[in-house]
Every structure is written in C-alpha cells, then in structure tokens.
Amino acid sequence: MARLFGTDGVRGIANYDLTPQLAFELGRAGAYVLTHGTHRPKVVVGKDSRISGDMLECALTAGLTSVGAEVISVGIIPTPAVAYLTRLYQADAGVMISASHNPVEYNGIKFFDKDGYKLPDEVEDRIENIIKEKIELPSPIGTGIGTRKEYTNSHRDYIEFLKSTIDGDLKEMKIVIDCAYGASSTIAPILFKELGAEVILHGAEPIGEKINVNCGSTHPEKLQQLVIENGADIGLAFDGDADRLIAVDEKGNVVDGDHIMAICAIDLKKKGRLKNNTVVATVMSNIGFEIALKEQGINLIRTKVGDRYVLEEMTKGGYSIGGEQSGHIIFLDDNTTGDGEITALKLCSISKESGKKLSELAACMITYPQVLINAKVKNELKNAYLEDEEIKREIENLEREMRGEGRVLIRPSGTEPLVRVMVEGKDYDKISQMAKELAELIERKLN
C-alpha cells in the first residue's frame, strides 16, 4: 500500500482515492495521535469551496467525534485561517479539507498541530500506521462521544487578525482581486474593502464547480486583463485555499513569488525586521532572485521543493520570511503557514507606503532565462549522477563558466524514470546548449 501522506497532507480524487471511509479513518486516527489520547480534545475543521467538501467534512467529523473530540466547524475559509484559529481557540489540532490549486475533482485533508504547524513526517507516519495496521482505538459511548459546533464568528476573527499584520490602510488604492471561486471569497472582498481600497472582484463566490478553473494564481490571464481595463494599481490572485498569492502589476505583468519575496525582504531589511538578514526559498527560486538579494546584502538559504521544508528551515534558524516561486510565502512573525492574504496585504502596504507602483518595486529583480530538459534514465539509476565523477565535473565546469550569473540544478523525478536538468543564466541560447549537452551526458552515463 502506497504512503497516504504526500508533501501536503492526504490528497487524491474525491470519492475515488479520498473516500468518505478514508476521511472517517483519518479523523479517528488523527484526533487520537494529535491529542495524545486526551479524553475531550478540541479540533478546528475548515474547508475550501469544492463540492466534495461537505461529504468529506461529514465523514471526517464522524471520525473525530467517534473518539470523543469536540469539533469546531469554521466553514469555507482559507487554509492559513485554520492554522491561526487553532491557536486562537486553544484547540488541540486543526484540519483543513482542500486540494489547494488542484482541479475540482481533487480534494485533500491536511492536519495542523495545536500551534498551527503542519505535521512532521514522523507524526503523519503514526497516523498512517494506525489506519494501515487497523489498530483499535477507544470508542466512547454516551456522554463520551464528541459533538460538533459551528463557530459563526470565525471569519470575523480571521479578518481582524489579518488587519493587524500591517500598519495603516489601503485607501486610494484600486485593487483587482481574483478569488478563484475558492476559500478567499469569504475573506478577501470584505478585508480589502474595510481597509479602504476600491475593489474589483473576479471569481469571488465560493462556487465549488468553478474552483481554480481558468482563474486564480495558476491562471492569471483574466486578472491581467481586468487590471489593464480598470486602470488598477495592482491585481491579486489567490488559489483555491488562499495559501498562495500571485500578483499582477499596473501594466498587466505577472509578479511571481520570487519577486514578491524580494520586495518584502528588502522592505523588512529597511525596517530592521529581517531576522538574521536571511530569506529561505527552495531550489526552484530563480538565480535572479538570489542575485537581487545578494546586491542588498541579504543571505539566501535554499531547501528542497515544498513549503513544509521552507518552514522547517525557518523555524530552525528563526527567520522571518521564506517561500516558493509559486507564491506560497510564509511570514513567520504573523502565521505558521503560507498565507495569501497576509502576503497580499504586505505587498499592497509596501506599494502605498513607498509611493511606488508595483512594476517599480518588482524591478528590484530580473528573472534570468531558464531551460529545463528531461534526461531519460533507468528508474533505479536516477540518483547515480551524484556518484558519477564525469557528471559532477561537467556541472562544476558549467557553473564556473557562468561566474555566479547562472546555475545548474539536477533533480530526479519522483514519479518517472527521468532526471530533470535545469540551467539558468543570462544567455538563453548558451544555457540551452549547456542543458542539452549535460542531459545527453547523463543519459549516456546512466543507461
């Protein structure tokens, strides 16, 4: 049986991979492990707008209450809200039902501990082991069975918290917001209007059939069009559960996670709030991002792909900002997970405070051309490039040739018999040739 938990909880096609039975079992096992067998644990449960959300919430809630948990249902709400509300309500755990940026047929179940952090691998393994080994858990009866309560003030609690993460307001700003028909629909329109912005909305109803369909952070084309048509200052695109943000400048250009992190890190440094003068990002962040930070005297630490690895490094080193090119950005002084709304507020606030358009702010970084080529290799040899002296020597030669203005990244595919060869640098034709020759060398040596 394959591992249930991936890099972001349990995810799959709802009612096929992620069945109500599995949701029930996750509820039972998750509540038991996270609350250390406490008799009456408290668990916050939220969801995005997917049509399978009701089905899975009912099953999950049945599982949680069957081991005696008190369920606090907070309805359709962003993933980072569940992390925050778990702390605010002093709950023992939080659970979010969402598949983030994935298509509508998918859904997922993601757990948070009592402090609002995603679970480490070893805790997920314990939950998974209970399910796979069919370990018997307590089944209380009578008054020992848990109950479910709806907290109707949760959205207001989260909105007030979000407002506290910036100084001042957003008056005189014209902002287009794309909520991807997802969880941010219940928060972002109210939040930005209450802060005084003139708001133009797209995809701002929680319609499960439309979530992420040609909208949101993975499809910003409509947002780009609306920003230009309305003469807006900025466009903001969230994904289905609002843990990531992609922006659009006043000229209609996309501003990705690398640019947003660079803008925010430089601002934090100016204000003396960039802890340890360091930003954490993954190996996928562009070399242009690294160079932009270096020019400002800011250090960069890179991690494996996945916001959980970024967060682990941030908590270990006590850093204040980290994230991914995709727009998952963590402001650890404010929340314990990527938060699209916090990121949006910071970005808009910096633009207003500085009096600079987003295009001017984004000019702090130049995105270098990137070439990605897949080298086909035998599955069992995907990691052998690490030991091959000729391949290692060639990578060193290429990086030396680029003199700090480019880089080579080799990543074995997690699912296919491929090694991905990525080269970044100033000259597209040159790096294309480099990537092609390196991929050919890897194929020759590892087959």
UniProtKB/Swiss-Prot annotation:
Sorted alphabetically, the Gene Ontology BP terms of this entry are: carbohydrate metabolic process; peptidoglycan biosynthetic process; UDP-N-acetylglucosamine biosynthetic process
Q: How is it modified after translation?
A: Activated by phosphorylation.
Q: EC number(s) for this protein?
A: 5.4.2.10
What span is annotated as the signal peptide, if there is one? none
Top enzyme class: isomerase
- Enumerate the UniProt keywords alphabetically: Isomerase, Magnesium, Metal-binding, Phosphoprotein
Q: Where does Mg(2+) bind?
A: 100, 239, 241, 243
- Active site positions, chain numbering: 100
Q: Which residues carry this modification: Phosphoserine?
A: 100
What Gene Ontology molecular-function terms does this entry list? magnesium ion binding; phosphoglucosamine mutase activity; phosphomannomutase activity
The record ties this protein, via Gene3D superfamilies, to: Alpha-D-Glucose-1,6-Bisphosphate, subunit A, domain 3, Alpha-D-phosphohexomutase, C-terminal domain
Q: Which family does it belong to?
A: Belongs to the phosphohexose mutase family.
What is the protein name stated in its UniProt record?
Answer: Phosphoglucosamine mutase
From what organism does this protein derive?
Answer: Thermoanaerobacter pseudethanolicus (strain ATCC 33223 / 39E)
